[in-house]
């Protein structure tokens, strides 16, 4: 593939921007993965890797996870803050605390811990805190405890502090402080506390409710003052060491981040005036990733990079400190999405394709109803040279005629054959109009979008949207989707992707298309009998954890892929995926009991013994098989 062709494909799918140097198109037109851009010779052809795994028995769909991407993301964020601190003369430390709610899988947590980079862990529930405490011995032991807390949660955190870890119990509700003080006295431990301030600043987009005065979490200004006095009266004011705020999970606009940090810096200044020695400044999450590759302020993009993010935070905090003669606090970010999103790709196979094929239409019978004649006359007019009617008018006339035919069919005025002929002719007319439209003509763009959606191939993909990409369904989030091969060809077709659940919501509605978003996906020409595998990229944050069991489709298989500079690749199975039996047990349906009931039914039939045994074996094999569709 020429460099010009490769450049065009990169622009079509915006790979150069959302791929972030981890994903690229190689000379074969295949997706290439480079888990560590600092070691460019360590890369793997993803299409070839998947096919090799399939030959060894790998089932699809499957998650292909690249732990080296996790580690590179962590290094990159740490490096950005190091540069920012050096640039602005900032004397405080920086610490990334990974919020495990983003992806609690052991492979993720341990890959980050073993990266060799400074790392803390954040918990938002008792279960998460137990996981964090168990792993705390492997890292520098900074632990941040967020979320609602009962007595057991608080005791666990204090036990961690008693064991020598730095555990910051962030006060989110005033009711928590009394329990903290009681249990700290019982355990004879000095608590290490933080306060989450509820800012007036608020971001925009899908996660804007995390910030602002109506936020679910955090203390208002009056409550912050009340907390300070409560701790002062208890002789524990020195325990309040961390200031925390959180604007949202995916902040698209750097201006919103800068505004929030400046406001929170005022809290830092005012708390010091009250005698509170705040030592840590936790700006929470918000560091977004560019799912679209548009570098914009849209909900699924960001208009900044790591360096600009770090610069804005360090400058704003440092400036407030310099103005008021205060020490530079340690800065903490809880950048879970930015660390994990890129490292996982869901790969699946297309199990069926419904394509709109175009044939040369034949004239209707001479005595055909008027609506059929009208449709045919419009078709003929479209092919006459010098016609003065617009493309839009042709399209509108044909749509009205087809509508009349559908109405007439319902009342018996048209036969099934006549309806089929009309629909096929209308399809050909749409195709003819589509060929003559000019994307550069602003007036044509709505028609282009309408026809692309109408004419797109329907691709039925072996996956559950609800299990593997729940945010695409729940909040209409966009993820990069494209074939793993065939990217050396011009994307002349359009497609929509449908999952295998029995739910009309199981469809992807938005796709990357150059610098914009479309309702259909650009596709290179392909063999409908042997369609390409598809990759769903950047699903490493939240998707595995939020996935649900709609239609009892379970977790997919997952493999960890390690790529080395000599070209060698090491693959480890990290999750075997759920069986049908696993999913049935989740809903209190015992597989053994079901097998017994099925066996009883089979025995009551008049089938011969061999057939009965065959049916029983097939049922039992299905119970312990994959929940997704499998090739025979």
Curated annotation (Swiss-Prot):
Pathway: Amine and polyamine biosynthesis; agmatine biosynthesis; agmatine from L-arginine: step 1/1. InterPro entries: Ala_racemase/Decarboxylase_C, Arg_decarb_HB, Arg_decarbox_C, Arg_decrbxlase, De-COase2_CS, De-COase2_N, De-COase2_pyr-phos_BS, Orn/DAP/Arg_de-COase. Its EC number is 4.1.1.19. The keyword Metal-binding applies. The keyword Magnesium applies. Transmembrane segments: none annotated. One of its GO terms (molecular function) is arginine decarboxylase activity. It catalyses: L-arginine + H(+) = agmatine + CO2. It comes from the Bacteria. Substrate binds at residues 281-291. The modification N6-(pyridoxal phosphate)lysine is found at residue 101. One of its GO terms (biological process) is arginine catabolic process. Belongs to the Orn/Lys/Arg decarboxylase class-II family. SpeA subfamily. Catalyzes the biosynthesis of agmatine from arginine. HAMAP family: SpeA. This is Biosynthetic arginine decarboxylase. The lineage of its organism: Bacteria, Pseudomonadati, Pseudomonadota, Gammaproteobacteria, Enterobacterales. The gene is speA.
């Amino acid at each position: 593939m020429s460099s010009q062709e490769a450049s065009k494909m990169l622009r079509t799918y915006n790979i150069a921007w959302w791929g972030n140097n981890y994903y690229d198109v190689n000379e074969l037109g295949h997706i290439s993965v480079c888990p560590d851009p600092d070691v460019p010779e360590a890369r793997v052809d993803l299409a070839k890797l998947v096919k090799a795994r399939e030959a060894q028995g790998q089932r699809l769909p499957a998650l292909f996870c690249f732990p080296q991407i996790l580690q590179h993301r962590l290094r990159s964020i740490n490096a950005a803050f190091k540069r920012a601190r050096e640039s602005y003369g900032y004397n405080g430390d920086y610490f990334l605390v990974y919020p495990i709610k983003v992806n609690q899988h052991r492979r993720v947590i341990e890959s980050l811990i073993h990266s060799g980079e400074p790392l803390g862990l954040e918990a938002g529930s008792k279960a998460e805190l137990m996981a964090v405490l168990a792993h705390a011995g492997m890292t520098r032991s900074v632990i941040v405890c967020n979320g609602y807390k009962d007595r057991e949660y608080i005791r666990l955190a204090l036990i961690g502090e008693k064991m020598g870890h730095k555990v910051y119990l962030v006060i989110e509700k005033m009711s928590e402080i009394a329990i903290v003080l009681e249990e700290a006295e019982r355990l004879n431990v000095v608590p290490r506390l933080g306060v989450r301030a509820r800012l007036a600043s608020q971001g925009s987009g899908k996660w804007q409710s995390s910030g602002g005065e109506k936020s679910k979490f955090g203390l208002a200004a009056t409550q912050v003052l009340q907390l300070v006095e409560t701790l002062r009266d208890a002789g524990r004011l020195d325990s309040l060491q961390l200031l925390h705020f959180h604007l949202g999970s995916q902040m698209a606009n750097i201006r919103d981040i800068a505004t929030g940090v400046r406001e929170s810096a005022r809290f830092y200044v005012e708390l010091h005036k009250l005698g509170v020695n705040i030592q840590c400044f936790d700006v929470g999450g918000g560091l977004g990733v560019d799912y679209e590759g548009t570098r914009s302020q849209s909900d699924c993009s960001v208009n900044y990079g790591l360096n600009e993010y770090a610069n804005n935070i360090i400058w704003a905090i440092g400036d407030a400190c310099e103005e008021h003669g205060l020490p530079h606090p340690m800065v903490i970010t809880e950048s879970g999405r930015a660390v994990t999103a890129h490292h996982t790709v869901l790969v699946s196979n297309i199990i069926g394709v419904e394509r709109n094929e175009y044939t040369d239409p034949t004239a209707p019978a001479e005595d055909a109803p008027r609506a059929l004649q009208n449709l045919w006359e419009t078709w003929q007019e479209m092919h006459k040279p010098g016609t003065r009617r617009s493309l839009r008018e042709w399209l509108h006339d044909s749509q009205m005629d087809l509508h009349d035919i559908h109405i007439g069919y319902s009342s018996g005025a048209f036969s099934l054959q006549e309806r089929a002929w009309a629909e096929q002719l209308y399809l050909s007319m749409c195709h003819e109009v589509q060929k003559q439209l000019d994307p550069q003509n602003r007036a044509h763009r709505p028609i282009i979008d309408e026809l692309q959606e109408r004419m797109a191939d329907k691709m039925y993909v072996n996956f559950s949207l609800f299990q593997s990409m729940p945010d695409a369904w729940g909040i209409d989030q966009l993820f990069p989707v494209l074939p793993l091969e065939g990217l050396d060809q011009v994307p002349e077709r359009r497609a929509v992707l449908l999952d295998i659940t029995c739910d009309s919501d199981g469809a992807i509605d938005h796709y990357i298309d150059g610098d914009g978003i479309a309702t259909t996906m650009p596709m290179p020409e392909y063999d409908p009998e042997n369609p390409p595998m598809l990759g769903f990229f950047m699903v490493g944050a939240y998707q595995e954890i939020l996935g649900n069991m709609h239609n009892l489709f379970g977790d997919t298989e997952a493999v960890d892929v390690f790529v080395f500079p000599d070209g060698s690749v090491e693959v480890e199975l990290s999750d075997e995926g759920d069986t049908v039996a696993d999913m049935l047990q989740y809903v209190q349906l015992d597989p053994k009991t079901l097998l017994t009931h099925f066996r009883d039914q089979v025995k009551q039939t008049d089938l011969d013994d061999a057939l009965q045994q065959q049916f029983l074996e097939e049922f039992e094999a299905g119970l312990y098989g994959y929940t997704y569709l499998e090739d025979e």
